[in-house]
Amino acid sequence: MCIRDSAKGVQAIRFFPKHGHLILSAGLDSKAKIWDVHGSGKCMRTYLGHEKALKDITFWNDGTRFVTSSWDKKVKLWDTETGAVISTVTSGKVAYCVKSHPDDDQQNVLLAGQSDKKILQYDWNAGDVVQEYDQHLGAVNSITFCDEGRRFVSTSDDKSIRVWEFGIPVTMKYIADPTMHSAPAAALSPNGNWLAFQSLDNQITVYSTKDKFRCNRKKVFKGHSNAGYACQVGFSPDGRFVASGDGDGKLFFWDWKTCRIFKSLKAHDKVTIGCEWHPLEQSKVATCSWDGTIKYWD
């Protein structure tokens, strides 16, 4: 299935949590949209409120609400069903990435990685910043929770990876060496043991979340050309495959065990920026691109 979303391009997509019957898209035309992917492929709702291109998007665990960040420097909390904006916050900087806390009881907590090197922790109940994590030396590109939400990992233009205890604004572990490149996208494996990072030297590197966050040198996934784009990386729900788009519009699947390319295909006319596995069906993947389309693969 191919959905033509926006002439300006699609920055990110997210499946509706736990069910995957709908896809939420973040457009470069400033609009968020929700699509019926199991049936008609129709746009069910358009969410208007941002003034510039969207940067990131994240659902709450139950799907009733979602968060958007935009180049207009605003972060918004939306009601998925009614389309109403529940709350808007701004720090005066662009939030490059937004992540809701994974715990069902802490959905009011949001982390936003910013263009000014800071990670801000918002509480939607208070409508304000409750904590600042300020140790990166460049813009923050990704935030990934691990260890059941007790820790999170951030990547930055400063080419480092930092591990934090949630709620404590001091880096617990700092990972950097001269051979490392910037890693603008990351994903946690389904078993929670591994973090995969999209590195800008055209490879996906893997770190353990358990053993002092060491790099697993045996696990490197290559063959794609990300060309400086923050192409999303993801694991299949069973953990057997890793997927990523690339700068040429291709979509790659690697075998987790062997690290070999399992399959690659031409998915889009421009960069395949987003790629999401269906939460229930192993064989289904959705991709989005700056060519303005969302595609649903089986």
Predicted regions and their residues:
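A short beta-strand motif characteristic of beta-propeller blades
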Residues: K42-T46, A84-T88, D128-Y133, V170-A176, ...
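Structural hallmark of WD40 beta-propellers
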Residues: G20-L24, I34, M44-R45, G63-V67, ...
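WD40/WD-repeat beta-propeller blade N-cap
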Residues: R4-V10, L48-L54, V89-A95, D134-V140, ...
